Design a protein with these regions (language model features):
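Interdomain regulatory linker/hinge segments that flank or connect interaction modules
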Residues: 1-18, 60-105, 226
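Functional transmembrane alpha-helices
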Residues: 109-133, 141-143, 148-149, 153-275, ...
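Membrane-interfacial segments
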Residues: 22-34, 283, 298, 330-334
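Internal alpha-helical transmembrane segments
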Residues: 1-43, 306-315, 320-322
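Alpha-helical transmembrane segments of multi-pass membrane proteins
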Residues: 11, 269-278, 318-325
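Terminal peptide-recognition signature
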Residues: 7, 46, 54-57, 83, ...
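PDZ/PDZ-like domain segments forming the peptide/carboxylate-binding groove
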Residues: 25-66, 106-144, 148-151
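Membrane-helix cytosolic exit motif
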Residues: 18, 322-333
Length: 337
């Protein structure tokens, strides 16, 4: 039994060890609540649950959420029951999460149900145009247009159409809010300014050697947990359509060489291989372990004929899965041509 589990054990150890060393060498980059000035743009599925555009995540099941980006993964895989949010108006509220939220995310195709909203910043002002006459300056952050909170370029363009002759802006400059009214220069509603999305600030967490061991182990544990939790979706129609083979694995690696990304991907694949090899499918280590445990508990060894048939069936299942996964790669690549 120890020999049969040797390869699986080495893969698990390698994956966890790599995550520990990654935390020690590079640390971890997160997006904190303070980094998200405008909160999240929330999907329709999450709006039905009770979330709203502009929400920030404070805690999940009573524990502070350090990395705001984690919320999508946690909702999908970790069976959380409640989320505390800070609304755009400053109100704190607790939202109860339905048990089937992961299935709803999968079926709707809204896996990224929380998309961080970058600040909309004025990049340049054209001279002798309505924007310059109104007093707008480069670097001003647009908060509201015609009374509506802005969550990206689309909201900005849609809000311009509310009034026919002018646009009311609430801007943030130097920590203070200003209200400005800009008349349109023509029927095309030209105001003479260029806007851009400001990059969301990241916070880097660095760890000493011993701290990195604990943080890396925790990261590896949750990586394994999330992967195992996602496995149940493979047997759904939506999940089966997203299976992939070598092409999908290749896309995990970055287009240009990056040592951190390389080792992160290697650690992930090591943990995935360890889990997959433990599945009770004949021809895999997990299948052999299953038969050995049966022999140990019953005192009877399965017949050679039975083992031959079982191994053949297991091999057939693996080949079928291999062909299906790589076939999906081909189909998806043709669709996106």
């Amino acid at each position: 039994l120890i020999i049969l589990l040797g390869g699986v054990t080495v893969n698990f150890i390698l994956g966890f060890f790599l995550y520990m060393m990654i935390m020690f060498v590079w640390g971890k980059t997160v997006v904190t609540e303070d980094n998200l000035n405008s909160g999240f743009k929330v999907s329709e599925v999450m709006q039905k649950v009770g979330f709203n555009d502009g929400d920030k995540i404070i805690s999940v099941d009573g524990k502070e959420l350090v990395d705001q980006f984690e919320i999508n993964k946690m909702l999908f895989t970790r069976n959380i029951s409640e989320v505390q949010v800070l609304s755009e108006n400053g109100e704190r509220k607790i939202i109860n999460i339905p048990e089937n939220i992961g299935t709803k995310m999968m079926e709707s195709g809204q896996m990224l149900s929380f998309i961080p909203v970058p600040d909309l910043v004025i990049d340049s002002i054209l001279p002798n145009m309505p924007a310059s006459f109104a007093g707008l300056q480069k670097g001003d952050i647009i908060s509201r247009v015609n009374g509506s909170k802005i969550y990206g370029d689309d909201d900005f363009e849609n809000s311009k159409s509310v009034n026919a002759d002018y646009m009311e802006l609430e801007i943030l400059r130097g920590g203070s809010l200003f209200d400005l009214t800009i008349p349109f220069d023509s029927s095309e509603k030209i105001v003479g300014m260029n806007i851009k999305n400001q990059m969301i600030k990241l916070t880097k967490l660095e760890y000493g050697f011993f701290d990195s061991l604990a943080v890396g182990f925790d990261y590896g544990y949750w990586t394994l947990y999330d992967y195992v939790s996602q496995f149940k979706y493979v047997f759904t129609k939506a999940g089966a359509s997203q299976l992939g083979g070598f092409g999908t694995i290749g896309k995990i690696f970055p287009a240009s060489w990056d040592w951190q990304r390389f080792w992160e991907t290697t650690a992930l694949l090591s943990i995935i291989l360890a889990f997959m090899n433990l599945l009770p499918i004949p021809a895999l280590d997990g299948g052999h372990v299953m038969f050995v445990l049966y022999e140990m508990l019953s005192g009877r060894k399965p017949s050679d004929k039975f083992m031959e048939y079982a191994t053949g069936i297991g091999f057939f299942l693996l080949i079928a899965l291999f062909l299906y996964a790589n076939g999906m790669d081909v189909i998806l690549s043709l669709i996106h041509i």
